[in-house]
C-alpha cells in the first residue's frame, strides 16, 4: 500500500504526528552525525575483520582477454561496449565469452551481479549481426523483473545494430504480446510459463529456427518447479544447430540433469562462489521480544533515515502492511511483491532506483536477479527459512566494493533459523546496539499506526471482494507459475 487514503490521513492521532516530528528531528541529527562518522566507520570496517559475510566471487588468475577490443567483435558491438563503459571484463565474462564466440555450448556458474548477462548477450549479438533472422535467440528467466533487466541489457548492447527485442512475461496482456511476436523480434526474453502459453496458443509463432537458447538463473528456474515446462519448451525447439547457454549460481543434481538433456559438449566456466568474509558488509541481529517487531523496525528506519533500505518480508501481506506503516509514519516507502501486476512492480522498482522512494519493502522476489545499485541497508523483518535466501538478501547491499549493512530482527521462533545461517556463514552474528528506551517510547504510537494500516487494508480487501462478487473466475493459465512465492 503506497499511501493510505486521505480519510485515514485526516484521522491521524496527535501521537502519530508527534512521532513523525521526532523522526524528522532525528533525521537532521543523523545527517550531521553521519558526515562525521562515515569516514571513521569505513576505516574501521576496512582495518578490522568485521562481522561481515557475503558470497564473493574470487576469480582465478585470468588467462582470457583484458579488453573487449581484443575480441573479434563487430565494430557496432565494440562501440556499444565503449558507450556502456565496458572496459575490463568480469571474471565470468573473461571465461565464458571466448568459447562462446567459438560456438561452444556454455555452462556458466556465477552469482547475480557478476556481469553474466553480458557474458551471453555479447556472443549472441555478434553472431546475429552476420545471420539476422527473426526468433534468433530465446532467453528464459525465472522472474519478470530479471527478464526485463535482460531485455534492457540486450537493448543497450544492440543499440547500434538495429536489434529488435521483446519481453514475454506473465501479468501482461497476451494479445499485446502476440502482436509483439508477430513483429518478428530477433531476441525473445521470457518467463517459461508465458512462453509456453504463446507456443501453444499464438497463431504463427514457433521457434523451429531458433539458434540460441539461454536458461538464466537455472537453479531458480528449477527451484520454482519450472522443470516440466522447460521439458515441454525443449520439445518445441530444434536440437540440431542450436547453441545453448545455461547459467546458474550452483551446480546441483537437477542442473546436471538439465544440462545433459539440453547441452552438447558444453564448456564449464565457473567463478568461485564460496562464502567468504569481506569487510564491506556488516551484519548484525536484534533479538526482538514478542509484539515489538514493528517498533524495532521503525526504530531502525529512524536511526538510518535517509539511507536507501530494502526491508525483506516472508509474505506479500506483510510487505503491503509494512509499506503502509512506513508511509503513514512519513517514511518514503514502496512495496514489491507477487500480487502486483507488472506495471506496478516496474513502477515500484523505478521509484526506488530513482531515489524517489528510499525504502523498498519486498518479498524474496527482489532478493535475487535484480541489479539495484547503492543499497545502504538491508533489514530482514522476517528471517528466511533457508540460508541461501538469506545470503541472496544481504547480497543486495555491499556490492561492487561498496560498504553496506544488514540487520535481522530475530524472534524466539527464529533462533533455529539463525543458527543454521550462522553455521553456513561460519561465524556468529553480533547483536546490533539498540537504545531500548527509545524503542519502548515508540511502541504505543507504532502499534496505533499499525492498527490503522490493518483497518485500511481490510477495508480495501472488502471493496475488492464486493467488486468481484458475482463475476465468473476465468480459467487460470501458466501465468500463475510466473508469480513468485510468498
UniProtKB/Swiss-Prot annotation:
Pfam families: DEAD, Helicase_C. One of its GO terms (cellular component) is nucleus. Residues 97-269 form the Helicase ATP-binding domain. It catalyses: ATP + H2O = ADP + phosphate + H(+). Residues 1-11 have a biased composition (Basic residues). The keyword Hydrolase applies. A motif (DEAD box) lies at residues 216-219. It is an enzyme of class 3 (hydrolase). ATP-dependent rRNA helicase required for pre-ribosomal RNA processing. Involved in the maturation of the 35S-pre-rRNA and to its cleavage to mature 18S rRNA. PANTHER family: ATP-DEPENDENT RNA HELICASE, ATP-DEPENDENT RNA HELICASE RHLE-RELATED. This is ATP-dependent rRNA helicase RRP3.
Amino acid at each position: 500500500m503506497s499511501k493510505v487514503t486521505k480519510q485515514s490521513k485526516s484521522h491521524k492521532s496527535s501521537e502519530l504526528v508527534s512521532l513523525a516530528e521526532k523522526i524528522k528531528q532525528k533525521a537532521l541529527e543523523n545527517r550531521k552525525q553521519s558526515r562525521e562518522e562515515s569516514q571513521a566507520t569505513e576505516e574501521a570496517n576496512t582495518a578490522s575483520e568485521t562481522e561481515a559475510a557475503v558470497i564473493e566471487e574470487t576469480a582465478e588468475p585470468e588467462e582470457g582477454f583484458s579488453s573487449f577490443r581484443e575480441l573479434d567483435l563487430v565494430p557496432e558491438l565494440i562501440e556499444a561496449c565503449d558507450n556502456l563503459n565496458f572496459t575490463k571484463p568480469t571474471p565470468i565474462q573473461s571465461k565464458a565469452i571466448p568459447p562462446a564466440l567459438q560456438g561452444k555450448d556454455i555452462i556458466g556458474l556465477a552469482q547475480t551481479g557478476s556481469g553474466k548477462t553480458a557474458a551471453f548477450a555479447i556472443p549472441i549479438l555478434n553472431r546475429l549481426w552476420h545471420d539476422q533472422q527473426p526468433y534468433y535467440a530465446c532467453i528464459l528467466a525465472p522472474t519478470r523483473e530479471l527478464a526485463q533487466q535482460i531485455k534492457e541489457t540486450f537493448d543497450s548492447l544492440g543499440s547500434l545494430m538495429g536489434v529488435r527485442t521483446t519481453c514475454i512475461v506473465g501479468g501482461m496482456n497476451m494479445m499485446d504480446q502476440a502482436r509483439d511476436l508477430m513483429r518478428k523480434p530477433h531476441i525473445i526474453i521470457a518467463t517459461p510459463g508465458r512462453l509456453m502459453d504463446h507456443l501453444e496458443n499464438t497463431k504463427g509463432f514457433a521457434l523451429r529456427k531458433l539458434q540460441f537458447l539461454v536458461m538464466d538463473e537455472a537453479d531458480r528456474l528449477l527451484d520454482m518447479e519450472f522443470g516440466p515446462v522447460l521439458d515441454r519448451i525443449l520439445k518445441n525447439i530444434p536440437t540440431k544447430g542450436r547453441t545453448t547457454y545455461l547459467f546458474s549460481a550452483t551446480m546441483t543434481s537437477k542442473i546436471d540433469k538439465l544440462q545433459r538433456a539440453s547441452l552438447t559438449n558444453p564448456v564449464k566456466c565457473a567463478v568461485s562462489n564460496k562464502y567468504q568474509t569481506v569487510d564491506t558488509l556488516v551484519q548484525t541481529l536484534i533479538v526482538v521480544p514478542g509484539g515489538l517487531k514493528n517498533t524495532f523496525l521503525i526504530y531502525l528506519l529512524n536511526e538510518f533515515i535517509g539511507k536507501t533500505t530494502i526491508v525483506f518480508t516472508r509474505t506479500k501481506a506483510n510487505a503491503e502492511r509494512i509499506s503502509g506503516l512506513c508511509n503513514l509514519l512519513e517514511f518514503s516507502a514502496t512495496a514489491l511483491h507477487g500480487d502486483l501486476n507488472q506495471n506496478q512492480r516496474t513502477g515500484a522498482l523505478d521509484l526506488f532506483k530513482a531515489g524517489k522512494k528510499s525504502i523498498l519493502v519486498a518479498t524474496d522476489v527482489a532478493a535475487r536477479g535484480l541489479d539495484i545499485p547503492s543499497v545502504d541497508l538491508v533489514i530482514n523483518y522476517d528471517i528466511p527459512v533457508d540460508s541461501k535466501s538469506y545470503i541472496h538478501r544481504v547480497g543486495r547491499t555491499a556490492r561492487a566494493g561498496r560498504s553496506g549493512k544488514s540487520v535481522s530482527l530475530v524472534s524466539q521462533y527464529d533462533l533455529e533459523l539463525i543458527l543454521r545461517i550462522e553455521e553456513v556463514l561460519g561465524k556468529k552474528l553480533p547483536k546490533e546496539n539498540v537504545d531500548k528506551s527509545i524503542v519502548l517510547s515508540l511502541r504505543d504510537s507504532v502499534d496505533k499506526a499499525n492498527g490503522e494500516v490493518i483497518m485500511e487494508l481490510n477495508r480495501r480487501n472488502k471493496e475488492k471482494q464486493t467488486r468481484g462478487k458475482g463475476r465468473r473466475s476465468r480459467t487460470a493459465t501458466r501465468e500463475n507459475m510466473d508469480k513468485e512465492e510468498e
